[in-house]
A protein has these predicted regions:
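Phosphate-group recognition and catalysis centered on beta-loop-alpha active-site segments
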Residues: 1-201
């Protein structure tokens, strides 16, 4: 469920997550931003303008300011729903649904601390577009506990080699694969290459 059940509730809202769970969804995708005072919240955009009644960059306002705002729905209409913190979302989903965290790897240490605090380490998928070397250098101490999903652009020249290297060094449960070029042959080739090794998102 992309940003929760965004068709019936505001994106990245607790109510949208709850409804996705009730619908029987296996994985809910959520986005993370950090406030000026270091609170991790659910928000796709870097600014509050599109999805809330507030204005400005998330990174330049406090959680106190955000707590007084209301979320807007897909038609930009104000709702009664509030902006949730990541911790609130983790507590809501604990033991109930897998979470695919987007835009969160830049806050890996802080996210991990919240996962440990809430007991949700085993139900969260962290992902990012970093190289194998960067992932090993920055996150290796977490990889034995956290599900990490590499994001690989198949339009890049070394995409196939990058996937092979990830399989060899990290053995990820899944890959998120992106491509735009219509003449790219890799989308046809990769499923066979990853069969029995990693899933494709």
């Amino acid at each position: 469920a992309h940003r929760g059940d965004w068709r019936n509730f505001p994106e990245n809202s607790l109510e949208g997550i709850e409804n996705a769970i009730k619908m029987g969804v296996d994985i809910v995708e959520l986005d993370v931003q950090r406030t000026q005072d270091g609170v991790l919240i659910l928000m796709h955009d870097e600014t509050l303008n599109r999805t809330t009644t507030g204005k400005g960059k998330v990174s330049e306002v406090t959680m106190d300011y955000i707590s007084n705002l209301y979320l807007r729905n897909g038609c930009a209409i104000r709702t009664k729903h509030k902006v949730p913190t990541l911790e609130e979302a983790l507590l809501l989903t604990k033991g109930r649904i897998m979470i695919n965290l987007d835009k969160a790897d830049r806050y890996f240490d802080e996210v991990y601390a919240l996962l440990k605090k809430t007991g949700t380490v085993n139900q969260v998928i962290m992902k990012g577009g970093k190289s194998v070397e960067q992932v090993k250098g920055q996150y290796e101490k977490y990889l034995c506990e956290i599900i990490y999903m590499p994001i690989v652009s198949l339009d890049k020249l070394n995409a196939e080699q990058q996937i092979e290297q990830f399989c060899k060094d990290i053995n990820p449960v899944a890959f998120e694969l992106l491509f735009i070029k219509g003449n790219n042959e890799l989308p046809k080739k990769i499923p066979a290459m990853l069969k029995g090794k990693s899933l494709i998102w």
